[in-house]
Amino acid sequence: MRIERLIPGRWLAVVLLPLLAACGDSSDGSGGGNKIEGMLPLGEYQDGLITFYDATGAGNCSYDPSPGNLDVAAMNIGQYLNSAVCGSCVEIEGPKGNLRVRIVDSCPDCPDKGHLDLSRSAFAKIADPVDGRVRVRWRPVACDVSGPVSYHIKDGSSQWWTAVQVRNHRLPVTKLEYRKNGAWVDVKRESYNYFVEPKGMGEGAIQIRVTAQDGQTLEDTLPGATSNKLFSGGSQFRAPTGGN
């Protein structure tokens, strides 16, 4: 259990993308580079420990509070992987049953590999809160999402400094690129879960390509780098065939 650092929620305007989206595995290597060292493959079990804190759904992953869904967790600092696990899901096997939670935060006070800090309500679904610290095992799984992925343009963004966050993704997102002068440009992901282009992505429409952990890619075109806007994409990553 720990003291949570909250990031204030923001009102978002949602704009539907009127166009182009493509989904598929990259066959020519152009969508490669999706491997992140230390990231568990989907379905691979990890022995671990669960604790709980006063989670709101917000945190270091820079998501808004989600009072309607608090099946959320903070990842131990070693497996947070500079926010690469943000928005991904894990299934936990606890004494009282199984539960799928979404990673929304990091836990700097959780030094051990496998440690997950859950919301109070999530913890109570699979273990007795009186126990406080419970040994479990868990595995990364696909998130049970509906609809397409979405893209949040961070407040303060413009054509000269652009930060994009991918939301509502079924699989872990490992890479984001944008199209510049006919070529895809890899964008660095920051620890607060935004892909940031410090020189900006330019004026007008922005072509985006995101890559999932398994190599699938999605392409969308955003109307522009409008500060604090949420744009709906055109498609979603396919669920893995193994049922994870």
Residue ranges and their predicted role:
Residues 19-22:
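C-terminal motif of bacterial Sec signal peptides marking the signal peptidase cleavage site
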Residues 1-12:
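Bacterial N-terminal signal peptides that target proteins for export
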Residues 24-214, 219-244:
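Secreted/periplasmic proteins
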Residues 16-17, 54:
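Residue-level signal for mature regions of secreted extracellular proteins and peptides
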